[in-house]
Amino acid sequence: MFAGYRKLDNLVVIVDLNGLQIDGAISEICDPEPLDKKFEAFRFHTITIDGNDFEQIAKAFEEARATKGMPTAIIAKTVKGKGVSFMENAVNWHGVAPNDEQFEIAMQELEKAGEALCQK
């Protein structure tokens, strides 16, 4: 409330909205939606993006920098564990470290995903 009231246009809040928390889907436990409307009620400019898309992230920060007279909330809709087949959207990976074998597999999958991004 303070940030919006004071028009803190140099403040950017980023919310990682992956739809999961430690014990399940947030929609079944404590659904925060509509999150954008809640921030707007506190005088925030809101931007909702695909948080797994680097171009959208960069554009959101450009828009936030250009926004005057109010703070910005970037709501980044993401996929938990994106790019690692056995971790994607898996609640059981919250706060758990992979073993050595899982780590190697994850790194290989992420390297392939990174190479694909560089080809764009």
Spans of features found by a protein language model:
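Glycine-rich ThDP/TPP pyrophosphate-binding loop and its adjacent helix/strand module
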Residues: 1-120
